[in-house]
């Protein structure tokens, strides 16, 4: 009797785990459709190859990042090759200073959903949030949103601004667990 109850419970656990992965699969399919609908609704032009550094981005041009499902990047502003001395608050002018691993990134952002009447979460200015989001570039333990690190690689320079379409698997933990894609407008500086 105990053995048949135990086997029944094991069977239920196996069935339940199979159902939850099917649900996750359906959620991922819905996410893919939501991203495709957003691209279509906004008439975005998708570039298949990474643009050169001096490419002038059209307003609706987005690069579909090679090797990453449903991650799209649009450069709004290239930024400059200037860094700031945080102690004296003076500019340190340099030529073509690219962001490198472990640079301390200071980020401001706006985040909104892909539905037509999506809510917006803004950390764009001190009116929205007193302190910006800070993390070291390429350190996923400080910023688990892989999409941000991918975007910074493409932004290349401090003071850059971009817009990214982020599937849940590349987002923050809360986005990953809810299988919710977002669009971010991301503005970065490098703090020394």
State where each predicted segment sits:
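Acidic/polar, low-complexity intrinsically disordered N-terminal segments immediately downstream
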Residues: 19-80
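Short acidic-hydrophobic surface loop/beta-edge motif
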Residues: 6, 63-67, 162-164
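A beta-strand/beta-hairpin structural motif
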Residues: 75-78, 85-90, 112-192
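Short, glycine/small-residue-enriched coil/turn segments at secondary-structure junctions
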Residues: 63-65, 71-106
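Sec-dependent bacterial lipoprotein signal peptides
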Residues: 1-19
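Low-complexity, intrinsically disordered short peptide segments enriched in small/polar/basic residues
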Residues: 7-12, 32, 36, 50-53, ...
């Amino acid at each position: 009797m105990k053995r048949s109850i135990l086997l029944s419970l094991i069977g239920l656990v196996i069935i339940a785990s199979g159902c939850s992965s099917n649900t996750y699969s359906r959620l991922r399919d819905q996410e893919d459709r939501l991203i495709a609908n957003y691209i279509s609704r906004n008439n975005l032009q998708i570039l298949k190859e990474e643009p050169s550094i001096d490419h002038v981005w059209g307003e609706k041009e987005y690069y579909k990042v090679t090797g990453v499902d449903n991650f799209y990047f649009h450069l709004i502003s290239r930024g400059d090759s200037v860094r700031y001395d945080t102690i004296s608050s003076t500019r340190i002018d340099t030529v073509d200073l690219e962001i490198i691993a472990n640079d301390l990134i200071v980020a401001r952002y706006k985040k909104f959903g892909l539905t037509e009447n999506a809510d917006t979460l803004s950390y764009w200015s001190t009116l929205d949030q007193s302190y910006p989001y800070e993390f070291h570039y390429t350190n996923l333990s400080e910023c688990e949103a892989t999409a941000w690190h991918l975007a910074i690689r493409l932004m290349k320079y401090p003071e850059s601004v971009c817009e990214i379409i982020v599937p849940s698997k590349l987002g923050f933990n809360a986005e990953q667990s809810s299988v919710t894609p977002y669009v971010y407008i991301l503005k970065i500086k490098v703090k020394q």
